[in-house]
Amino acid sequence: MKKTLDIKKLVLLNMPYILLGLFATNFGEAWRMAQGADASEKFLSLVAVLPGALQSFWPSLHPLDLLVGLCCGGSLRLAVYLKSKNAKKYRHGLEYGSARWGTREDIAPYVDPVFQNNVILTKTESLTMNSRPKDPKTARNKNVLVIGGSGSGKTRFWLKPNLMQMHSSYVVTDPKGTILVECGKMLQRGAPKLGKDGKPMKDKHGKVIYEPYRIKVLNTINFKKSMHYNPFAYIHSEKDILKLVTTLIANTKGEGKAGDDFWVKAETLLYCALIGYIHYEAPVEEQNFSTLIEFINAMEVREDDEEFKNPVDLMFDALEAEKPNHFAVRQYKKYKLAAGKTAKSILISCGARLAVFDIAELREVTAYDELELDTLGDQKTALFLIMSDTDDSFNFLISMCYTQLFNLLCEKADDVYGGRLPVHVRCLIDECANIGQIPKLEKLVATIRSREISACLVLQAQSQLKAIYKDNADTIIGNMDTSIFLGGKEPTTLKELAAVLGKETIDTYNTGESRGRETSHSLNYQKLGKELMSQDELAVMDGGKCILQLRGVRPFLSDKYDITKHPNFKYTADADDKNAFDIEAFLSARLKLKPNEVCDVYEVDTKGA
């Protein structure tokens, strides 16, 4: 079948030359009809007989005539082939570049017809939350990179409008704690539950059904206004212990010299041993950082007595006698290979790294867990991570929380839900550069998409990301299908953005005037390549404008989203101070039970009420 189609195509392409060749057989017939003893006489006679030969539209089938037709048709085909082969390639109007701004038609395939099911990007552009659209080529991940200098509206023009969509679970980094205060009541109210037709669902009484959010908060500015977060509660295996230790070391400082790999590895051994013992052997109520601190405080080392055993040594000796292949024992034995002086230095470094846990409030807030990080993909939840934008002393807790969050949700998606969480989880990481390093983030952003998780990094400059993640920063940026520039003047960001936008071809003309005995004028037209927006133009971009780049689509120069136009704006504290969320009242109204607290449970029958 394929061969027949190829022959048909070949015949169609060469049909004009075949017809011309058949018509040219008449010239062969005219030559044969011409009278003359030699070629010159035949040429003179050809003029007389040619009109008669051409009167017939039917080709001559005489062998000589067919040869003439074949030569004429073949010669023309050869001439056309040679001309096309050597032809110059012109791209009129695109000689120096084809860059242009995107239009409504460019973004249309990526927008969901139901407004609430979109990620808001700009005033006129949005991206569907559907990770499996009808046309697979329009599928894009929901990772977003937002770059904007101080005061460019990263929170007001982008983060808050997306929080108002209320189509997913949210993890929001909240510098200063203002986002929770302004949007908390809106989330408590929730959004109407939408049916398959995109319309709000109603109960049997005709009332609209709302889906209120569970609200969780970790406040590192004021621990009295925070729920409890215990990283130990999410340890389920030996690899979880190593992940926790890696995050702790990456975001805290010890006493070893910067970049000294020995001290880092030695501390890792000790932390793994102690946390392993706490996880596998200690009661649930003692599985926290307070117990870890007590262990380190009890580890006395005597440089002049290598045989001395402190209480922790005795505990591990007893564990080894009972379980010689225990994970904690194997790690502790490696740590004990260090000589007395070295071991003392390791303990000093550990003490310095965990010095913040000498603060009673921090020990109390990490005593047990209320955040339930592994349930964020089960039902709509909003987790606010409040951190200081001036003091990074406790930001390691935020980084630790994100690390455990990503790992827990990915594992739950794979083990429980067949690879995809029932509720999409969006991480809106404002002031991303201030929370510290999330280990293996470059790998996480590449793999979380398929689990219905997305990460949105909000930065003041692109160089901030490179300062933290070094060479991996480009990999992280490459896995962000969407990037938005809200304005700024950081040179590296402007240079890279101008290069990515590309060049367009413009028309220019030059005028000249020469004076002498006679005055003459000249006018010269030419084409040049110009950057779609140069660095200086980006630096002075209008404060109400932003630049959107979506993978595979032309860039957009658009207006920033007007938060007051959102349907849910009226439920926020920005619209009415009465909508302000009271964190203290919210936390005090909740029943909080500690792990060792005893209470009575009653079952109430409301059927007869």
What is each of the regions a protein language model found here?
Residues 14, 22-29, 140-453, 468, ...:
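P-loop NTPase motor domains
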Residues 49, 54-56, 64-118, 238-248, ...:
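Short alpha-helical interface patches
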Residues 99-101, 126, 142-143, 330, ...:
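General secondary-structure edge motif
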